Regions:
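Conserved C-terminal structural/oligomerization subdomain of aldehyde/semialdehyde dehydrogenase
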Residues: 68-210
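Glycine/small-residue-rich pyrophosphate-binding loop that anchors the diphosphate of NDP-sugar donors
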Residues: 1
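NAD(P)-dependent aldehyde/semialdehyde dehydrogenase
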Residues: 7-113
Length: 210
């Protein structure tokens, strides 16, 4: 639940995000009928409690009566901040920066395996590096969310974010129990399998094992 951005494009990216939020929801998102609300009062209070006013660069306003919280960007976030300690499930985007791809990769892999990873880059080598060497449940390159919008691709996590996948055929396979059965004929039962285990039996077995 965070944005990890190259420090060289940090300012430009935040400017574009702010512009796009205003384009989609207007100057006052809380008054926009198309802008959703938090599911209940308890969750609203939890999400609002994750907002550090000193780090808000966009949004930050909440309206308890309608259970709405503005799209909120927190900049200058550190790994120790409260917003980085749990899944957010709300309209808050913590922003952190990196100076090298090694630093970015280490930052992600040093934390619990994410359910999803979204890689934004025009460089195919960068795309492949993070797809192949960073563990995560699933994701997209230069897009978000769409990997779970199709029944032809499994959706699921790894480690702390869950095990197994579902959607489409993956759901059937994940939630089905496959029984392993050996069905042996009764007309033959090789005595070789049973005691006493003479030395010649050991030699015979080793011939096939090695």
């Amino acid at each position: 639940d965070y944005l990890l951005v190259d420090v060289r494009v940090h300012d430009e990216l935040l400017g574009l995000i702010k512009e796009e939020v205003r384009h989609m929801f207007g100057e006052y998102p809380l008054d926009n009928e198309d802008y959703g609300h938090i599911v209940n009062a308890k969750h609203f209070a939890r999400v609002r409690g994750l907002i550090d006013p000193d780090k808000v660069v966009l949004g930050g306003t909440a309206r308890e009566a309608s259970l709405k919280i503005e799209p909120t960007i927190l900049d200058g976030v550190t790994p120790d901040d409260a917003v980085m300690q749990e899944e957010i499930f709300g309209p808050i985007l913590p922003v952190l920066t990196f100076e090298s791809l090694d630093e970015a990769e280490a930052f992600i892999t040093d934390r619990p395996t994410p359910l999803a990873l979204y890689i934004f880059s025009q460089d195919r080598a960068v795309q492949q590096r993070f797809v192949h060497y960073v563990p995560f449940g699933g994701g997209c390159v230069n897009d978000t969310i769409m990997h779970l919008a199709t029944s032809h691709m499994g959706f699921g996590g790894m480690g702390a974010s869950g095990m197994g996948q579902y959607h489409g055929r993956e759901s059937f396979d994940t939630f089905s129990h496959k029984k392993s059965i050996v069905n042996k004929a009764t007309w033959l039962d090789v005595p070789f399998r049973y005691a006493p285990y003479a030395s010649w039996k050991h030699k015979f077995v080793r011939m096939f094992v090695h």
